[in-house]
Amino acid sequence: SLVELGKMILQETGKNPVTYGAY
């Protein structure tokens, strides 16, 4: 799902909550 993908990206960056907000 896009939400899980967003969480995965958020964990990798760790400094970009805006990325998670996009999902």
Curated annotation (Swiss-Prot):
Subcellular location: Secreted
Tissue specificity remark: Expressed by the venom gland.
GO molecular function, one term: toxin activity
Main location: secreted
Keyword Coiled coil: no
Highest taxon listed in the record's lineage: Eukaryota
The keyword Iron belongs to this UniProt entry's keyword annotation: no
Gene Ontology cellular component list: extracellular region
Keywords for this protein: Blood coagulation cascade inhibiting toxin, Hemostasis impairing toxin, Myotoxin, Secreted, Toxin
Known role: Snake venom phospholipase A2 homolog that lacks enzymatic activity. Induces acute muscle damage after intramuscular injection in mice and disrupts negatively charged liposomes but not positively charged ones. Also exerts a weak anticoagulant effect only at concentrations of 40 ug/ml or higher. A model of myotoxic mechanism has been proposed: an apo Lys49-PLA2 is activated by the entrance of a hydrophobic molecule (e.g. fatty acid) at the hydrophobic channel of the protein leading to a reorientation of a monomer.
Family: Belongs to the phospholipase A2 family. Group II subfamily. K49 sub-subfamily.
Subunit structure: Homodimer; non-covalently linked (probable alternative/compact dimer conformation in solution).
Name the record gives this protein: Phospholipase A2 homolog 4
The organism's taxonomic lineage, starting at the top: Eukaryota, Metazoa, Chordata, Craniata, Vertebrata
